[in-house]
């Protein structure tokens, strides 16, 4: 009992003993400044901080919001422990921009929407508009719309195979080269290019030798005839395959409304103006072909005399020579830079040649109109300048036109001849002959002479070349009608003026630097 009482007294002493300035647990010290009903003071504003908490996976990461007040309110014991890991958040999915709606509508909804068009994709789709919104709808392969769209897309209205212009031309040329036995090198190298003219000439040459051997020509060479047939054949092939060139005529020809038969004794040049008359004297070698022809055709105007060097020459005085208006002040065989290069030694003979061609056209084509008969088919380019993109050459730019008289034609009896084509030459014994643009350069000893060739064909033979080319097409392709060959009408252009100076041209060089810097 005593021990129990002593223990109680010691416990009471402990209760009354304050610990470090504070009241006992059972009797805390009074707080006069605080009443039980007084509200607690306001808390300071929260300051939020962000802290990244990593997870075990390397992809996921979370952001945890931590309040500053919560940090301060934590007890020392709890502040030492790590904060609890918040629950993991699901990763946010990236939202893409929605594309056009692809929906499967019912049959009732199909009637309410408007069909815009049917696409050509596979599987097929149709693009429709509904409530102002355009959407794409998949179409089943068994849908009748899909079958109809497919048939419309591939159907050819002409029921013909779809081929290109190049393929059509190559098919025609393959048949021609096979029939007329061209060399393998010419066949393999042919690509239907504008500058490839040799194949056409070979085909026409073989055709003339096989089908028209010994064809009569008047003041024309066989080489020029086949060359012109090759040009016309190239024009037919391009017309059949619908190939067109903007700045180049493959035939090198034109239809000239010359008007040289409108007034008696007056002829016109390529400018369309009347040519002027001037005296002209020609001296030719006695042994030359031209000298002998001058003695036979003009015995009253030709005479043999000596020139200033003491040589015997045939001197032919032409008092009826005609020249272009721009060459009025130029000497013989001299042309100005504005000239067309046309010159006739005899104006009356030139007019007879134009009349002969007009009568010849009416005899060959009786249904032709008078205006069409007055249009002459003339070659603009000879072999020298008949190239795509060819630069102007020195001298004359068009073929030289020379009237040739037909000897002994006046002696024929008109009553004994029934062929109207022959009667045209009997009544008008002169032919217009087309030669190289600059035939004077052929025998010239000048070092800077321009190009020249042996191009020579008369106006009737040029028309015959066109007729033979059409005959060649009919014999080779009887099931295909002859294509239309549209030849342009001649119009004077400044690029056809006579050139006294040649333009400088460059040459190929393998080096990139000409001076090896």
Swiss-Prot record:
Renumbered residue ranges of the record's region Flexible loop: 282-316
Keyword tags: DNA replication, DNA-binding, Early protein, Host nucleus, Host-virus interaction, Metal-binding, Phosphoprotein, Viral DNA replication, Zinc
GO molecular function: DNA binding; zinc ion binding
SUPFAM superfamilies named in the record: Domain of early E2A DNA-binding protein, ADDBP (SSF47724), Zn-binding domains of ADDBP (SSF57917)
InterPro entries with a match to the protein in the record: Ad_DBP_C_sf, ADBP_zn-bd_sf, Adenovirus_DNA-bd_a, Adenovirus_DNA-bd_N_sf, Adenovirus_DNA-bd_zn-bd, ADV_DNB2
Main location, first listed in the record: host cell
Phosphotyrosine: residues carrying this PTM: 180
Region (C-terminal arm, DBP binding): 501-517
Comp. bias intervals (Polar residues): 1-10
Positions of region (Disordered): 1-110
Compartment annotation: Host nucleus
Pfam family, one: Viral_DNA_Zn_bi
Residues annotated to bind Zn(2+) 2: 382, 384, 436, 453
Biased composition (Low complexity): 64-80
Domain text: The C-terminal arm bridges DBP molecules together, thereby creating a chain.
Function as written in the Swiss-Prot or TrEMBL entry: Plays a role in the elongation phase of viral strand displacement replication by unwinding the template in an ATP-independent fashion, employing its capacity to form multimers. Also enhances the rate of initiation. Released from template upon second strand synthesis. Assembles in complex with viral pTP, viral pol, host NFIA and host POU2F1/OCT1 on viral origin of replication. Covers the whole ssDNA genome during synthesis. The complementary strand synthesis induces its relese from DNA template. May inhibit cellular transcription mediated by the interaction between host SRCAP and CBP.
Assembly behavior: Homomultimerizes on viral ssDNA bound to pTP. Forms a initiation complex with viral polymerase, pTP and hosts NFIA and POU2F1/OCT1. Interacts with host SRCAP.
Family listed: Belongs to the adenoviridae E2A DNA-binding protein family.
Protein name: DNA-binding protein
Organism: Human adenovirus B serotype 7 (HAdV-7)
Lineage, uppermost ranks: Viruses, Varidnaviria, Bamfordvirae, Preplasmiviricota, Tectiliviricetes
